[in-house]
Amino acid sequence: MDSSFAERLVAWQKKYGRNNLPWQKSHDPYVRWLAEIMLQQTQVKTVIPYFDRFIERFPTVQDLAEAPEEEVMKLWAGLGYYSRARNLHKCTKEVQCRFNGSFPIELSDLESLPGIGVSTAAAIRSAATDEPCAILDGNVKRVLARHGMIGKGLTPRETENLLWADARSKTPLKEGRTYAQAVMDLGATVCTRTKPLCALCPVNQDCKAFQTDSQLEFPVKKVRAPVPEEILNLAVYTDGNEVRKSERYWKGLWTLPQLRDEEAEQSEEVLPAIEHRLTHLLLRIYPVRLPIPAKIPAAWKAFTKEQIKTEALPTPIRKLLLEVL
């Protein structure tokens, strides 16, 4: 175990780390799980108001498990990566069924639940119990890859295995909760992706990337395939109430009805186009304004402009509607 690395990070965390985040007030595994899921691919400052609203509305596993999915999606709307919200709801239902409503802390139990991977399970257990658990989220990968210059000339699988081995060797036997938060905070606030603040880093003296001025070369970037694109023609209806129906791109949310090309071409008013990046897809959205049809499909729902501000709509659709109505 690299005790020196851990000791420096723990000391740094106590003095400079983020120690007053709302979820840190509790060691309840349900609370820490909710925070960890929200923090996936999302910045802390964005998560905080969503976390506060969720905990206020769903203070227990049972509250979230018994809530309608539409209400969960409505509270989540705007946070992105919507499969997280669906897994969130599904997860609490499983906890109710399999663990009698008591959120588990064993790694194997956590990893068996929807939306919880190996690193997330470790982060939850460490936060809830203070036990040493190696974690390897995106921030931690960046710290370790730079510190040990790990990844050059290796396959992604080889790199992942080495990073996990390094994470385990550096995890201390004591103060697991503080260390886990420290290594995540270091990656989020100091060892950042584009402009690392290496002069402020507590482990810069033995960071190989810092010593060779090669920080931005790590983690080694994967060769990515071109992002596929899809075109959506969407109808904006503005005679009175706004009409919505659920579509496949934002499952569980309300969005605008999709049109065929020939239907879109019949519109007299074309609205500004939008580009929106999903996880593995670029959507090119072409909205057009149309009168409400005489016969409204049963799957559609009418919203007022005020409802658009609060209902479960994808961020680009909400923004579009508030701009054009």
Residue ranges, per PLM feature:
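Catalytic cores of DNA base-excision repair glycosylases
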Residues: 2-197, 203-212, 216
